[in-house]
């Protein structure tokens, strides 16, 4: 049975996009597919969130876009990480690791006796 869909916490979509693109360049639909595939359908992103995020990341200089032929033979905008995009991803991962580590400590805390 597939996992139920989970809303992406605010502020994490950019990090997830950067991570997917660190694996290989992809077009928007391919990014959405990889997110869903890797997360076993828990993470699903709609176009209304994905494309504004891609535009924002490109404006910040973290992505570059090139028009290429897709698997279907149609032209598509393929995104890839820039050097500053890789640097930003490392920073985002470090922050995420610190936060999730702190949350884990809080969850693991036992009641006072």
Question: Residue spans of the language-model regions?
Answer:
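A positively charged, amphipathic N-terminal helix/segment that binds anionic biomolecules
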Residues: 1-3, 79
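Short beta-strand/turn micro-motifs at beta-sheet edges
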Residues: 3-7, 67-68
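N-terminal helix-turn-helix DNA-binding core of bacterial DNA-binding proteins
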Residues: 5-49
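Basic amphipathic alpha-helical segments that dock to polyanions
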Residues: 50-57
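Beta-hairpin "wing" of winged helix-turn-helix
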Residues: 58-74, 80
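Accessory beta->alpha helical hairpin/"wing" motif in late/C-terminal subdomains of nucleic-acid enzymes
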Residues: 81-85
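Amphipathic alpha-helical dimerization/coiled-coil segments
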Residues: 86-113
